[in-house]
Amino acid sequence: MAITALLTVATGCGKDEKPSSSSSSSSTSSSTSAASSSSAASSSASSAAPSGTAPLADYSNLLVTAADIGADTTLGPPEQNPGGVAGVAVTFSNTSKTHTITDLLVVFTDAASAAQGAKDRPASLGKYVTGAPQPFAVGTNGIIVVGPSPDNTKSVTYVVFSEGKVVVDLEFDSGPNDAAPQDFVLDVAKKQDDAVKTRTTS
């Protein structure tokens, strides 16, 4: 999954460059695939936070909950400030682990930096999903990419947007030729957007 690359980009940024966020899937949706590898984030990314990101802290209150995703959705333990970058990451999955959503939030010092981070993000997504970015009507600079993974082992739906000072990366992984339903993706993205919008302090 793309957490490692995102955080590597973040730590290489100056104050005007930003990272993004990522997610893991639901049980009630008809997506179908083996889970993504979000736990490698902190070990693979630099521990020096870029100047454009916020102070390290507990940002888990900004995440959506398993109840927001679906009835039989399980929640992995949140990873605080993965890779030494301000934010939080978590993976949701159904009980059989065939559908996952990886949710990564990266917190910046200001909304302009976060918006630029979301705008720059599509250039790095080709490593994780094969498809052309399309506009996505959530947050600022929202995009969505739907397609197979480069190795054709799973279907991937990747969503990126910013909300205020936060960049949200949501990655929905499922079985080959069984992409997450678009209405489900939109619902999860809106819930995450609302959570950030209502819980972020200025």
Task: Give the positions of each predicted feature.
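Short, well-ordered beta-strand elements
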Residues: D103, K165-S174
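Short Gly/Thr-rich strand-loop-strand
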Residues: A66-P82, A115-Y158, D194-S202
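C-terminal motif of bacterial Sec signal peptides marking the signal peptidase cleavage site
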Residues: T8-G12
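N-terminal "mature-domain start" segment
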Residues: G14-T91, N141, G175, Q182-S202
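A short acidic-to-branched-hydrophobic micro-motif
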Residues: A89-Q116
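Short, surface-exposed beta-strand/loop micro-motifs that present aromatic residues
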Residues: A86-N94, S155-E163
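N-terminal export and membrane-targeting signals
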Residues: M1-I3
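A short, structured loop/turn motif at beta-sheet edges
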Residues: F108-A112, F136-G139, S162-G164
